[in-house]
Amino acid sequence: LYPQAPNASGRQLVRLSPHNGDDAQNSGCDLPEGLLPVVMEQAIKGKPKGGPAFWSVQDLWAWQQGQDLDFETVNRQGASSMPVELRTHVKIESRSWAAEEGKLFQTAAYDLGNAKKPHHAGWEEAHYGFLVQSEVMLNDDLAKFGGEGRLSHVKQTQAISGFECPTDLASNIERAGGLRLTLLSPAIFSGGYLPGWLNPTSKEGVLPHSQVKVRLRAVAMDRWLPVSGWDLDQNKPKAMRKAVAAGAVYWFELLEGS
């Protein structure tokens, strides 16, 4: 969270963690059975403020390792939102191929191009993009990308550091008796907010591709995201599904296995 005390000059960066005190089960929340409330590790009187929704890989990794970060650094290296481009369209009559009067609609899409500088000073040098790992060699080229088939530039780049698995990760998890899982992208689970491999009653299950049995103890997440689209094969809208938003954190307790 990014709270700001009433008399403070800037915002703070505060961790959230499960609360397992004597009053945990009487917190006044309608949490699912067996889950602990997630609270601030520091008691700060103040309301949450806005801040970067997207963090740099380096800041995210440092935060996961328990390092302290300041709001100014995270805000400078992160982003509050992705730029969105709105386009206005007209409906085309199928027989005459002419625009139907009054039939206007808009579409919105992420704008990953170079942003404009203020005061007509040109364009920013850096821009956003999708990072894709491929099993085959891809040459620099132009391609249609996304649901609208936008013309995009495919360019080779160096692998980004920060996603390597630490050699001591397994021993640290075993020593702590649990692990914390953070979603880097939205996820659709068969159990709503619960992955399908977890028992909805006991909140226990075996981690995929392992023999490690865990129990879910707490969850911190934003509102669900709607996922839908247009089915070209059936010529109708796809059924809407609910996805867990990126940034959701799941706390697990180790039960069996190593």
Whereabouts are the PLM-identified features?
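Conserved active-site/ligand-binding neighborhood in enzyme cores
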Residues: 1-258
